[in-house]
A protein has these predicted regions:
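Trp/Phe/Arg-rich N-terminal binding region typifying the photolyase-homology
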Residues: 1-85, 189
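Glycine/tryptophan-enriched, flexible segments
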Residues: 65-221
Length: 222
């Protein structure tokens, strides 16, 4: 059980608080709620952050106090509220616990197969923050201005290639937002790329308010 393992690591390192980034996936949110209750009962301080989205899905609603179901009015409402905090600089140091928890080397888990099925991924992606920042830099410098039409051309590197980095938290949407803002692009808030970030926000908005959309359409006729 992940809760038990988390408690064990916290106890072994002498931690008194647990911090993490929220997920609005219904199943994960339910798991996290149970984890919070368990950890607080055990005496740990807990706090979560909205690091993977520009806005909390619970903060956007129609004038009738309901969640949005159509993208355009949703994104217009978001743009009126959006003022994401500036990204913090990379920390110069991290405090290590006096005692490291018992652990295994990755190779001891025997996760690698004899067939190297990851070779294609390694050629296409550079996992981690460095790879994410490089892709963002290359995109804003060389592809952003032509994104509207080059994104549909398979033979051209016309997209940001940031999707996996955003998914795994290797770069934040706040970093992307400010990079586009500082790129010098005209009317950047109304650009197609910023709108694509909006669709990402809208997907999480629907997932939070309409959890049945994991397996079913938002509207029954469809």
């Amino acid at each position: 059980e992940s809760i038990g393992e988390l408690q064990q690591v916290a106890k072994e390192t002498g931690a008194t608080a647990i911090y993490w980034n929220r997920s609005f996936n219904p199943k994960i949110a339910s798991r996290d709620a149970a984890m919070v209750e368990n950890l607080r009962t055990s005496g740990f301080k807990t706090q979560s952050f909205r690091a993977n989205l520009l806005l909390d899905p619970r903060a956007i609603e129609t004038q009738q106090g309901r969640p949005y179901t159509v993208f355009t009015p949703f994104w217009k409402a978001c743009l009126k509220q959006l003022n994401p905090p500036s990204p913090l600089p990379i920390p110069t140091s991290l405090i290590r616990p006096d005692k490291q928890p018992d652990t295994l080397d990755l190779h001891e888990l025997h996760l690698e197969h004899q067939v190297d099925w990851t070779v294609g991924m390694r050629r296409a992606w550079a996992p981690g923050t460095s790879g994410a920042n490089l892709n963002l830099k290359l995109f804003t410098r060389y592809a952003l201005q032509e994104y509207d039409h080059q994104r549909d051309l398979p033979g051209v590197v016309g997209t940001s290639r940031l999707s996996p980095h955003l998914h795994f938290g290797e770069i934040s949407p706040q970093q992307v937002w400010y990079a586009i803002a500082e790129s010098g692009a005209a009317e950047w808030k109304n650009s197609q790329f910023i709108t694509e970030l909006g669709w990402r926000e809208f997907a999480q908005h629907l997932l939070h308010h309409f959890p049945h959309t994991i397996n079913e359409p938002l509207r029954a006729p469809f």
